[in-house]
Amino acid sequence: MFAIIKTGGKQFRVSEGQEIYVEKLNVEPETTYQFQEVLAVGGSNPVLGVPFVKDAKVTAQVIKHDRAKKIIVFKYKKRKKYRCKQGHRQSYTKLLITKITV
């Protein structure tokens, strides 16, 4: 059985026992989190939501919060001595999907 959930402006296809990385959630590590915005549930009896599946929930265990690898944004203009270097690290939350209920 799998489900498609929406979090952080993105959609994820998840199944039980899967670990996923999502945009940072405002919850403590080692707690459970429930996703209410379930777009679809698949398996032997698939269900599509309009826009969400009614009474469907995905429960996940919060493993940790972390930050991704640093990326460098470098802008320049040729022959003008314009250089601009900026770095960015995105925060994320690592989750373990424990249960999908319909």
UniProtKB/Swiss-Prot annotation:
UniProt xrefs under InterPro entries: bL21-like, bL21-like_sf, Ribosomal_bL21, Ribosomal_bL21_CS
Alphabetically ordered keywords of this record: Ribonucleoprotein, Ribosomal protein, RNA-binding, rRNA-binding
PROSITE patterns for this protein: RIBOSOMAL_L21 (PS01169)
Listed GO CC annotations: cytoplasm; ribonucleoprotein complex; ribosome
GO terms for biological process, alphabetical: translation
Domain of life: Bacteria
A molecular function GO annotation: rRNA binding
Pfam families found in the cross-reference section: Ribosomal_L21p
Biological role stated in the UniProt entry: This protein binds to 23S rRNA in the presence of protein L20.
Oligomeric and partner information: Part of the 50S ribosomal subunit. Contacts protein L20.
NCBIfam families: L21
Similarity-based family: Belongs to the bacterial ribosomal protein bL21 family.
Protein name: Large ribosomal subunit protein bL21
Native source organism of the sequence: Aster yellows witches'-broom phytoplasma (strain AYWB)
